[in-house]
């Protein structure tokens, strides 16, 4: 069981899917990642409390601080942002969804000892489908914007801490993430273009 006592803890094994009424939490192939799918599209993507209830129903105990730490970002088409994480004691779990446009979002397990270490899972999140992606602490995260004028809302279990931030190259050959854009199409932030290889990840997080 992987635990983090600042904002979130996985308190029980997650069933393949769990339903709280408004959102269904579906387990993804990479251990710990969840896709929240609305039972009815209207309003679900914007309802943070419904998302919290769905996570708790799936066995993830989210504290009240989860609602406080949110970030809204806007992107043009083909912008790639990632792969990023925050190290302990500031490790973040995050819940992502699109309020406008669409993104392809990805999480990569970098927890030493995890059965899915080095594996990734990606999902398309859009304002239309209302899907939300839960990426636990101990994961790299990234996204690619699929439309112009895309707006993304991320809720974090911990606030941003620049001293704890780390990055890995988005198209690292070891990870082999299957991005929806080519190297030539991708629009990168300067810092992301200079990020190191996945081989630099040495015991950033532990999974017991």
Task: List the predicted regions and their residue ranges.
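Short beta-strand His + acidic residue motifs that chelate non-heme Fe in jelly-roll/DSBH
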Residues: 133, 141-146, 154
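Non-catalytic, conserved peripheral segments adjacent to functional cores
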Residues: 2-128, 147-149, 156-208
């Amino acid at each position: 069981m992987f635990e983090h006592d600042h904002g979130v803890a996985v308190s029980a094994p997650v069933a393949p899917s769990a339903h709280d009424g408004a959102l269904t939490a579906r387990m993804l192939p990479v251990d710990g990642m969840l896709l929240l799918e609305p039972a009815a599209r209207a309003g679900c993507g914007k309802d943070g409390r419904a998302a919290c209830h769905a996570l708790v129903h799936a066995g993830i105990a989210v504290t009240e601080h989860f609602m406080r730490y949110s970030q809204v970002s806007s992107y043009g088409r083909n912008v790639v942002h990632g792969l990023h994480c925050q190290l302990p004691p500031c490790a973040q779990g995050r819940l992502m969804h699109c309020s406008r446009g669409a993104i392809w979002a990805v999480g990569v397990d970098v927890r030493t000892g995890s059965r899915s270490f080095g594996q990734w899972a990606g999902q398309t999140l859009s304002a239309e489908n209302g899907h939300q992606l839960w990426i636990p602490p101990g994961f790299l995260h990234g996204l690619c914007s699929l439309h112009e004028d895309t707006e993304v809302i991320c809720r974090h279990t911990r606030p941003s801490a620049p001293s704890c931030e780390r990055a890995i190259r988005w198209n690292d050959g070891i990870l082999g993430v299957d991005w929806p854009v080519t190297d030539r199409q991708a629009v990168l932030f300067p810092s992301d273009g200079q990020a190191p290889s996945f081989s630099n990840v040495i015991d950033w997080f532990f999974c017991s």
